[in-house]
Regions:
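Short, basic/aromatic-enriched C-terminal tail that caps enzymatic domains
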Residues: 107-123
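Short, solvent-exposed polar/charged micro-motifs at secondary-structure junctions
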Residues: 21-23, 103-108
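Catalytic-core segments of class I nucleotidyltransferases/pyrophosphorylases
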Residues: 32-102, 118-123
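Short beta-strand-to-turn element immediately C-terminal to the catalytic PLP-Schiff-base lysine
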Residues: 26-28, 54-55, 106-107
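Conserved beta-loop-beta/alpha segment of the NTase-like Rossmann-fold superfamily
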Residues: 1-29
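Short, acidic Gly/Pro/Ser/Thr-rich loop/turn segments
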Residues: 19, 60-62, 111-113
Length: 123
């Protein structure tokens, strides 16, 4: 989906399906990322970040340069919020919604068991 996207800078987003570690995303009518949060009540979310992105070299460079300038004052700044900073201030990051992607983040064996039972059947 991202490879075929017309956007040079895009993030894959799905409808909210998970119950752990979500990053909710908000985007405008042009599909440009405008906000993200782990708290779904903090924004008008349109989906959930999967963690797969297509970034141009120039976007990635700006992101790395900006992150380097922020690390001293914001040492726990996650890449999700760095993507948001760049999208808001420098270059738009477009949201590509895919309703057919079924996924699950696996952090431990318990997650793996859950994924095998509930997600693998869609593969």
């Amino acid at each position: 989906v991202l490879i075929d996207s017309k956007y040079k800078n895009a993030m894959l987003v799905t409808p909210v399906r998970k119950f752990q570690d979500q990053y909710y995303v908000e985007y405008d009518r042009n599909d440009v990322l405008t906000n993200c949060s782990t708290n779904k009540n903090a924004l008008h979310y349109g989906g959930e970040m999967v963690g797969i992105h297509k970034l141009s070299r120039s976007f990635f460079r700006k992101m790395c340069e900006d992150y380097a300038s922020q690390i001293q004052t914001s040492p726990k700044l996650g890449y999700e919020f760095e993507l948001l900073r760049i999208s808001r201030m420098m270059m738009p990051l477009h949201v590509v919604m895919d309703n057919d992607v079924h996924w699950y983040e696996i952090d431990d064996e318990k997650d793996l068991i859950f994924a095998k039972k509930h997600v693998a059947k869609y593969c």
